[in-house]
Regions:
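N-terminal Sec-pathway targeting helices
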Residues: 1-18
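Glycine-rich beta-strand-centered segment in the early N-terminal region that forms part
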Residues: 65-80, 94-141
Length: 370
């Protein structure tokens, strides 16, 4: 069986490499607009990059966007950073560069996704928002003073009880946790759920959401984060510096893995016979190699066809409904936003990303936009 699995994985990898070579030829001439645009007539500050790598981030004046007929113009008040941002900035794993259309240089120079702010203007077809409304959500190019977002896209009204920093923390981490627990993990009352990386951005949301679904939750974190994870409602906490959860006797119905630091076979050992293993967002930013965590995701997909256990990777899908649900849960006190650090300027985006990259953030890392 193992030999068959290995050959299947090899064939899949070969096909992926061939696909990549095709994309490589198509995108070899990929470039961007750095140095080619005229000086902005209506400038705003934004974090941009002309090449891959954290060292290439710059805070520059670019043209302030104007909303089209179906968009809202948002004055950004706060943004948050995610592992996704690190992958996007670094173009890592290398396979990702083909997916975003920039093998040599990034095609898109704008950065950031999670935001919260105030509507400054709306397009002629927009009726659900008006100038002055406070909103939050996700949009490419969020690391800026202004952004335009389709009014029916991933944007929702910000509840009055939330700060801009809290609201900016919700989008990717909150939706990933909600969809991981509800949709991919299919958590049911009474099930035993283990969350690896319980003190991070997604993990802090996932612990609380899994508890709201009636699960018996075990969180895995470091010694310094035990009290935090307990305060979020975890029934049990495993200190990974002292204990390896894959070597314990406990079996879990669902494992939500935000870290990806154990092999699939190790995780399968502590899954129930019909258990569900969910690799969240590709694992940590430390995954290296051409495919990064995608290799593990492919292995998981293959495993699932030969065993009763379900194994796979999930990426959050933008959802206005889920944004609204999460905001209501936070506003009502049913869900707590954990913020580790708040930086005070867009110029500190590189520092925020470096801190997140270390892998020890407690909850979310936020930046206030001046």
């Amino acid at each position: 069986m193992k030999r068959i699995l290995k050959w299947i994985v090899r064939i899949v990898l070969i096909l992926l490499v061939l696909a990549f070579l095709f994309v490589f030829v198509a995108y070899w001439r990929s470039t961007n607009d750095c140095g080619k645009t005229a000086a902005p007539t209506n400038p705003m500050k934004a974090v941009v990059r002309c090449d891959y790598g954290l060292a290439n981030l710059k805070l520059e004046d670019i043209e302030k966007p104007a909303p089209d007929a179906d968009q809202v113009l948002v004055k950004v008040r706060a943004v948050s950073v995610n592992p996704y941002d690190w992958h996007f900035i670094e173009g890592s794993p290398k396979f990702m560069r083909a997916m975003i259309g920039g093998l040599r240089k990034p095609k898109d120079i704008r950065l950031g996704v999670d935001f919260a702010g105030t509507v400054e203007g709306v397009g002629k077809n927009v009726t659900q928002y008006k100038a002055g409304d406070e909103v939050f959500g996700g949009s490419t190019g969020a690391f800026a003073q202004y952004l335009c977002r389709r009014a029916t896209g991933a944007v929702a009204p910000k509840p009055a009880g939330l700060t801009f920093e809290q609201a900016a923390s919700i989008n990717i981490a909150g939706i990933t946790a909600l969809q991981g627990v509800r949709d991919k993990g299919k958590v049911q009352p009474g099930q035993k759920v283990l969350i690896n990386g319980a003190s991070g951005g997604v993990g802090t949301f996932a612990v609380q959401i899994a508890k709201s679904y009636g699960a018996d939750v075990t969180g895995v974190c470091s010694t310094r984060n035990i009290e935090l994870v307990q305060s979020l409602g975890a029934d049990h906490v495993i200190d990974y510096t002292k204990e390896d959860f894959t070597k314990g006797d406990e079996k879990y119905d669902v494992i939500l893995d935000n870290v990806g630091n154990h092999s699939l076979s190790e995780c399968r050992r502590v899954l129930t016979p019909n258990g569900n293993y969910v690799l969240i967002g590709g694992g940590s930013a430390n995954e290296q190699g051409f495919l990064g965590a995608l290799g593990k995701a492919l292995n998981a997909a293959v495993y699932s066809h030969f065993v009763k256990q379900k194994m796979g990777m999930m990426m959050a899908q933008p959802s206005t409904q889920d944004l609204t649900l999460l905001a209501e849960m936070v506003a009502s006190g049913k869900l707590k936003v954990v913020i580790d650090r708040t930086y005070k300027s867009l110029s500190e985006v590189p520092d925020a990303i470096r801190y997140l990259e270390q892998g020890h953030a407690r909850g979310k890392v936020v930046i206030t936009v001046e």
